[in-house]
């Protein structure tokens, strides 16, 4: 028994020492490159293969899980796409798990502000909330890589994802891209609050057949237009991550394009993450028909220095290794960028990290960032500045509530907050109708509401009122969440381009205007 006790004590002592082991890659006094080299030496092959996915975790070495978040106009942890995950409801049905966040106007609205300081603050708020949910013990939403900003250019309004872009101008988009990156990543010279992963490189300008088409143009258009926001995002914004688009450029699909290494890494200095879009490996083989097998496609992706797959890849990487299509050194080169991002997020430091953001969400009774007054005021300011006055020839605006006895608010979007596919769940919502009613609280002005023109309801409301406000527009994901489907031709969304630029409610607007020339279109 005595010898057994000694053996047990020695075993426990060994386990204790192992648990407290300090690895060379945790030494913050070493250069970034030496730390990454040291980590690569510690990794087993299966761990390296795992790091080709979107999680930066290495549990054996104490490196915590860290995945991706959507965050084009605020952290998305809910919304139509259920970015917050799903859970079982009381009736046993699977329902979305919504976590409230501060949601700002879509990127196109952010572009309309022309305000780099505001767009930076939008990034700051989103990253603060990402850290809060990551580090709050009750949540632990393990993600600090933000899929934002979208540095694509909205050159054609028929593009189904126009609202995800800051606009069609390369210079403006570049300035706002840089601002948003700086907000997301923070101002600390060593650590990032979150990592900004731009998308979608390059020329993701169409949704229909995006999985198999090639955007063809010369090097001048590359440098001066399509790639310019990404170039500035890397060289000035110091983003070290982006997503490769589904489409090709002058032939090769972007996830295997030589320019990833030759230009973005070797010339621009992106030493971080390059990831595929969701399902891009399968599309590379089955839509682009670039490679005969999945193993050959997977090997080509890794050799192009694309270091993260957003779809099933492990069996194909293993097959590529077995067949000699890929080497462990190829994988090392591809995942170095992932490890650099992990380093800048403080994930490689161990428990004694100097990360200045590590306590966000850990303070007892901490007020959630989305409930703070400064967050509400920021959302209000950004929303106000995103509104563009196109025409006011009669000087109808601004309205004077004290001089109005009756105002008509009309249209299908007057009393509705529509979330897009990449939206989260707002902490609070105020519709246009509610906002107008709140502004007329004194009771001197009657507010009439008509959703549409059924039985002349809208026309009669307009005739009764001194002013009519008509709210029309597009639905940002086609009124139904079905993929590849938009029942209204002028609606667009991811995977579906618009077939028309005619608003579905133009007739309603014309009838209201005929009944009351004092009509405001929103």
Where are these regions (language model features)?
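Glycoside hydrolase catalytic-domain context in secreted enzymes
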Residues: 18-522
């Amino acid at each position: 028994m005595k010898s057994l006790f000694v053996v047990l004590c020695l075993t426990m002592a060994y386990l204790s020492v192992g648990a407290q082991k300090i690895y060379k890659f945790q030494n913050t006094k070493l250069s970034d490159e030496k730390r990454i080299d040291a980590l690569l030496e510690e990794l087993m092959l299966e761990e390296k293969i795992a790091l080709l996915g979107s999680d930066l975790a290495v549990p054996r070495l104490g490196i915590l899980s860290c995945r991706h978040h959507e965050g084009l106009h605020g952290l998305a942890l809910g919304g139509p796409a259920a970015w917050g995950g799903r859970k079982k409801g009381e009736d046993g049905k699977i329902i979305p798990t919504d976590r409230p966040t501060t949601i700002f106007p879509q990127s196109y609205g952010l572009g309309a502000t022309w305000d780099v300081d505001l767009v930076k603050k939008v990034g700051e708020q989103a990253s603060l909330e990402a850290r809060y949910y990551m580090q709050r013990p009750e949540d632990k939403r393990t993600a600090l890589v933000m899929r934002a900003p979208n540095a694509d250019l909205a050159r054609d309004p028929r593009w189904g994802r126009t609202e995800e872009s800051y606009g069609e101008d390369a210079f403006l988009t570049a300035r706002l891209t840089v601002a948003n990156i700086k907000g997301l990543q923070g101002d600390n010279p060593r650590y990032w609050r979150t990592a900004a992963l731009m998308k979608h490189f390059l020329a993701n300008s169409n949704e229909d057949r995006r999985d198999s088409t090639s955007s063809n143009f010369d090097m001048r258009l590359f440098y001066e237009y399509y790639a310019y926001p990404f170039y500035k995002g890397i060289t000035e914004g110091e983003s070290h991550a982006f997503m490769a688009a589904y489409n090709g450029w002058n032939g090769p699909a972007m996830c295997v394009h030589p320019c990833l290494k030759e230009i973005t890494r070797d010339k621009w200095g992106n030493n971080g993450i390059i990831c595929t879009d969701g399902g891009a490996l399968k599309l590379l083989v089955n839509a682009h028909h670039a490679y005969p097998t999945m193993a050959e496609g997977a090997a080509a992706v890794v050799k192009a220095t694309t270091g993260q797959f957003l779809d099933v890849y492990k069996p194909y990487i293993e097959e590529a290794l077995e067949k000699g299509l890929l080497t462990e050194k190829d994988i090392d080169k591809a995942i170095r960028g992932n490890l650099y991002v992990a380093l800048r997020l403080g994930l490689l430091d161990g428990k004694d990290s100097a990360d200045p953001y590590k306590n966000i969400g850990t303070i007892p009774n901490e007020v959630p960032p989305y409930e703070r007054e400064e967050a509400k005021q920021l959302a209000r300011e950004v929303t106000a500045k995103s509104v563009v006055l196109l025409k006011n020839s009669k000087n109808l605006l601004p309205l004077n509530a004290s001089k109005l006895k009756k105002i008509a608010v009309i249209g299908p979007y007057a009393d509705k907050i529509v979330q897009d596919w990449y939206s989260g769940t707002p902490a609070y919502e105020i519709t246009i109708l509610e906002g107008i009613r709140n502004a007329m609280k004194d009771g001197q002005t009657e507010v009439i509401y008509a959703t549409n023109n059924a039985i002349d309801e809208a026309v009669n409301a307009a005739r009764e009122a001194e002013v009519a406000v008509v709210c029309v527009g597009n639905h940002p994901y086609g009124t139904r969440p079905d993929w590849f489907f938009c029942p209204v031709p002028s609606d667009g969304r991811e995977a579906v381009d618009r077939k028309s630029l005619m608003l579905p409610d133009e007739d309603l607007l014309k009838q209201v205007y005929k009944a009351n020339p004092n009509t405001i279109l929103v």
